[in-house]
Amino acid sequence: MAIITRIEVQKRNNERYNIFIHQNGQDVYAFSVDEQVLIKQGLRKGLDIDAEQMKQILYEDEVQKTFNLALHYLSYRMRSVHEVRTYLKKKDREEPIIEHVLHRLTEQRLLDDHAFAEAFIQTKRATTSKGPLKLKQELAEKGVSEKTIEGALTTFSYEEQVEQVKAWLEKQKGRTFKGSSLAWKQKLSRQLLAKGYTSPVIEEAFADVPIKQEEEEEWEALKAFGEKAMRKYAGKKTGWELQQKVKQALYRKGFSLEMIERYLND
């Protein structure tokens, strides 16, 4: 048994307290605890504590320190359960204590993967042009379950996805593209697929926001590609065969047969 003889607040952290006990005729430092543990365990001057009690007090203090670490981590933004668990492991917290803290945070609704997923999707929709498949991937990387992700994605309807793609396409209209209208559309389609939109959503958006080069710009692009193809094949082919090679090259670039014939007949 040991008797607590003195309790002092720490100079650098007024939420932690140093506990002193009587030993060999004098006061000696025994351990320190968080204020929450001090109150919960009823620590006070004159209290007798045995080795088992001290062990429990120190365990509670480790739990509280880990809880405080998690709260600090959560103070910057919402996190998934997986993110908090990973963070605490990196801080060398023990597994049983981590699970204890995660359970406590969840009970207090400070951790909620469904709320996190919904907030994550809402923020990304407002600040980026990412589609549902990309958002699903990013949430999975944060350890959110597929069931939870699917539930949260119901807030991002098909119609809203189409509208978001249309808004993105409108922004692309003012950009310069040296190529055919078809090649431009294909390039934008690839970008949208990479952003996480499905083909049906993309096609519906294109139907409402047609992507087409100005005729003069497309004609200039065709001539540039045509001249390049002519130089490439001129040393190998002549006459009709040369024209066919150039025609094939331009067709692969997405130019219409009508424009290609016009170029070759000029």
From Swiss-Prot:
The gene is recX. Keywords: Cytoplasm. Gene3D superfamilies: Winged helix-like DNA-binding domain superfamily/Winged helix DNA-binding domain. Belongs to the RecX family. NCBIfam families: PRK14135.1. It is found in: Cytoplasm. Modulates RecA activity. InterPro entries: RecX_HTH_1st, RecX_HTH_2nd, RecX_HTH_3rd, Regulatory_RecX, WH-like_DNA-bd_sf. PANTHER family: REGULATORY PROTEIN RECX FAMILY PROTEIN. It comes from Halalkalibacterium halodurans (strain ATCC BAA-125 / DSM 18197 / FERM 7344 / JCM 9153 / C-125). This is Regulatory protein RecX. One of its GO terms (cellular component) is cytoplasm.
